[in-house]
A protein has these predicted regions:
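DUTPase catalytic domain/fold
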Residues: 1-168
Length: 168
């Protein structure tokens, strides 16, 4: 029995499992003719670029539609981040909810909403339809179960919160 277990978890098994994680198929639907398949720009990129197919703006936000819906596998999550070029060209602009979370059971269009921190400000450069506006990072996550206890284990940090690791 131990021999079977060992064979199952040898290097070739681990390598095959890892390669399957590297080529995780993600189903997607183009919701309009201008939609662009999310893709990595370069080898080594963690996020796939999302391209704007629609745009609307109010006094407090600008919103881009990507024209795509995705089917993220169970036990995975899509995290949405702004491209650095957005924050470089429009200082102070950030994603409305900091990081977008796309759950595996969501099937609607991926929308990217940026907060405009200074109402009435005219930005010289903002992304337009056809520009890459965000990055989608898909990662696995554990399904956790909280267990109530009377006391947590002790650590060097203890209850030190904001900025506590800078103080010795």
């Amino acid at each position: 029995m131990a021999q079977t277990w060992h064979r199952r978890w040898d290097d070739s098994y681990a390598e095959a499992a890892f390669k399957n994680r590297l080529n995780l198929p993600i189903k997607y639907v183009k919701l309009n003719k201008d939609a662009v398949k999310p893709e990595y720009s370069q080898d080594g990129d963690a996020g796939m670029d999302l391209t704007a197919t629609s745009f609307r703006v109010t006094d407090t936000f600008m919103e881009y539609g990507t024209g795509i819906a995705v089917q993220i596998p169970e036990n995975h999550v899509g995290l949405l981040f702004p491209r650095s070029s957005i924050t470089k060209s429009a200082p102070g602009v950030s994603l409305k909810n900091s990081v977008g979370v796309i759950d595996s059971n969501y099937r609607g269009e991926i929308l990217v909403r940026f907060e405009l921190p200074y109402p009435g400000t005219v930005y010289r450069t903002i992304p337009i339809v056809g520009d890459r506006v965000a990055q989608l990072v898909i990662i696995p996550y554990p399904r956790v179960k909280f267990v109530e206890v009377d006391k947590l284990s002790d650590t060097n940090r203890g209850e030190g919160g904001f900025g506590s690791t800078d103080k010795q």
